[in-house]
Swiss-Prot record:
Protein's UniProt keywords contain Disulfide bond: yes
Full protein name: Monogrin 2
Organism of this sequence: Argas monolakensis
Anything else known: The monogrins comprise about 4% of the total salivary gland protein.
UniProt function note: Tick salivary platelet aggregation inhibitor that plays an important part in the anti-hemostatic strategy of ticks. Inhibits platelet aggregation induced by ADP (IC(50)~150 nM), collagen, and platelet activating factor (PAF). Acts by binding to platelet membrane glycoprotein IIb-IIIa (ITGA2B/ITGB3) in a metal ion dependent manner. Does not inhibit aggregation induced by ristocecin, an agonist that aggregates platelets independently from the glycoprotein IIb-IIIa (ITGA2B/ITGB3).
Subcellular location: Cytoplasmic vesicle, Secretory vesicle; Secreted
Molecular function (Gene Ontology), one example: toxin activity
Amino acid sequence: MEGKVLLCFALLLPFTVAQAAKGDTRRCGYLMMQRCRGDTTETKAWGFNYEEKKCQKETVICGTGGAPRNAFETKKDCDALCKGYSGPQYSMQEMLQHIRDNAKKTG
């Protein structure tokens, strides 16, 4: 896999503010890539298909399960999205396996 990858992700059911207020224990996180964002295996696996081929310092992809997936420029934006989920962060091993599994499904 090209580039430096730091990972975390959320396999979550639909999220509500009320759940977050009660200390939701589900897992949440992000995928951060330092490379050109584009139509890559990693972004396809996450359900993204960027038309734009723009090189930048980093691309942060947040997954929140039932909610739409989002691409941000900074980890701070992802942290804000994941605020309220108190479950343990996914390990890099779990995330790499998730990406591999989804890449097989999306071809």
